[in-house]
């Protein structure tokens, strides 16, 4: 699929037609969820954050809004929506959830479920000073271009795993965030 002229309707159609298979197994891992906020426009955008440099883990990294599931969360989707509201002031009722991607295992011991949602273009994002340094939007067609991501094999504690690296403007997009974006691209039929 050529995605340089990807419209929101194209994205929605492809996502719905090629709905991912999610098995629901948690494998006794701690659960977390992230929101993949797609901005509703003729040429949609992908909303991302840069984490605060003051955070203990993943400081300064580009990420989707999200985090660990709390006991008060009714579901993984509820956790993603709560975290998006806490981190960037996206009201949960403004998100049209269209589905989830298969969970991803993090190096920090979480099983992370990406929740795909459409958000209005006129939201006023407000970054939580404690957690988020900045909020930015990347054109979805650019984010889903697989050629922009470069593999790096990392060896840790005797195990090897592949991470993906990319730049957008002055933001370094890598690791789990880049991997989730690539998975979304593959899910809607983008080919390398």
Curated annotation (Swiss-Prot):
MF annotations from Gene Ontology: coenzyme A diphosphatase activity; magnesium ion binding; manganese ion binding
Motif Nudix box positions after renumbering to this chain: 67-89
SUPFAM superfamilies the UniProt entry points to: Nudix
Nudix hydrolase domain ranges (all copies): 29-160
Cofactor dependence: Mn(2+); Mg(2+)
A family per Pfam: NUDIX
Binding site for Mg(2+): 83, 87
InterPro entries per record: CoAse, NUDIX_hydrolase-like_dom_sf, NUDIX_hydrolase_dom, NUDIX_hydrolase_NudL_CS, Nudix_NudL
Designated name of the protein: Uncharacterized Nudix hydrolase NudL
Source species of the chain: Citrobacter koseri (strain ATCC BAA-895 / CDC 4225-83 / SGSC4696)
């Amino acid at each position: 699929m050529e995605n340089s002229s990807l419209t929101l309707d194209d994205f929605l159609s492809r996502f719905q037609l090629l709905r991912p298979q999610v098995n629901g197994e948690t494998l006794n891992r701690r659960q977390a969820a992230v929101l993949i906020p797609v901005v509703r426009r003729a040429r949609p955008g992908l909303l991302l954050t840069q984490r605060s440099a003051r955070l203990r883990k993943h400081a300064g990294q580009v990420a989707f809004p999200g985090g660990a599931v709390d006991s008060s969360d009714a579901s993984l989707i509820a956790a993603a929506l709560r975290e998006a509201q806490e981190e960037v002031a996206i009201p949960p009722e403004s998100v049209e959830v269209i589905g989830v991607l298969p969970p991803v295992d993090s190096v920090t011991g979480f099983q992370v479920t990406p929740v795909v949602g459409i958000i209005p273009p006129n939201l006023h994002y407000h970054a939580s000073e404690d957690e988020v340094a900045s909020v930015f939007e990347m054109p979805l067609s650019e984010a889903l271009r697989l050629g922009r991501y470069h593999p790096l094999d990392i060896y840790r504690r005797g195990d090897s795993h592949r991470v993906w690296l990319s730049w957008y403007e002055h933001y370094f997009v890598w690791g789990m965030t880049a991997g989730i974006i690539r998975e979304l691209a593959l899910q809607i039929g983008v080919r390398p």
